[in-house]
Amino acid sequence: TENPDKFTENNLKKYRVVVFMSTTGNVLNSQQQNAFERYIQAGGAYFGVHAATDTEYDWAWYTKLAGGQFASHPGRPNVQKGKFTAVDRSHISTAHMPETFDRTDEFYDFKNFNKDVKVLITLDEKSYKDGKMGDYHPMAWYHEFDGGRAFYTNWGHTHETFDEPLVLQHIWGGLQWAASGPALNYNKPLRTGTLPEDNRFTKTILDKNLDEPTELALTDGGKIFYGERKGKLKMYDPKKGKVKVVADLN
């Protein structure tokens, strides 16, 4: 699905693994993020493909879950042939691989890398142009995180990738591992609490058509002071329900 509204606690309970299939940018709101955190903490699993690390940069929990963030990739061309090493062939997702092999894809450099992950495959930067991570360049990994499981593979930029038996078996093995954890258990204590639904809040507009508001302060008596960039200082009086300009610093 491309519908983030599916990220509710009741719906996520139906799935053993949630796949982020080359997502990019911000895809979930705070309610949906909350539901997904609780899903993982209840024993759910995450599977990230390629651009899944180019997703939700401001959500620190997700970065740790995914294992890192996209930093860059080669250009001109962005898709190249590279030499890989399966550094751990005891895992179900890599057991079928030779120790070293070549394949073609778009190779990410990563930042904010989670050093607690267990790396499965690395990339030799001497085998292609414009790599920026140096001698140690992870490309696929897994770990147990915050009560659940997470697996990530950087492969998957090109359509041809999904015609390669080696890649398909790698993905299938990763999915099998991710799905093999304990059953979901929402009855145990979860670190992330539930958020009330948006329709349970009442929103009141106190002022509008502001001219570049910059600062806001709330007094113990409930009055709200806020400034505008051009110098006006305004005050909202909750007893009168009105706004007035109390100073002009222009």
Residues of each region from the PLM?
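Extracellular ligand-binding/catalytic regions of CAZymes and related secreted enzymes
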Residues: 127-137, 144-194
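Catalytic beta-strand/loop cores that center a nucleophilic Ser/Cys/Thr
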Residues: 68, 73-147
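Short alpha-beta junction capping motif
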Residues: 11-56, 147
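Alpha-helical scaffolding within the catalytic cores
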Residues: 2-8, 34, 134-140
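Solvent-exposed loop/turn segments at secondary-structure junctions
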Residues: 4-6, 19, 23-27, 46, ...
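Aromatic-Pro/Gly-enriched surface loop or interdomain linker
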Residues: 1-15, 183, 189-192
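Glycine-rich, charge-decorated loop segments at or immediately adjacent to ligand/cofactor-binding or catalytic sites
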Residues: 54-65
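Beta-propeller domains with acidic blade repeats across secreted/periplasmic ectodomains
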Residues: 190-250
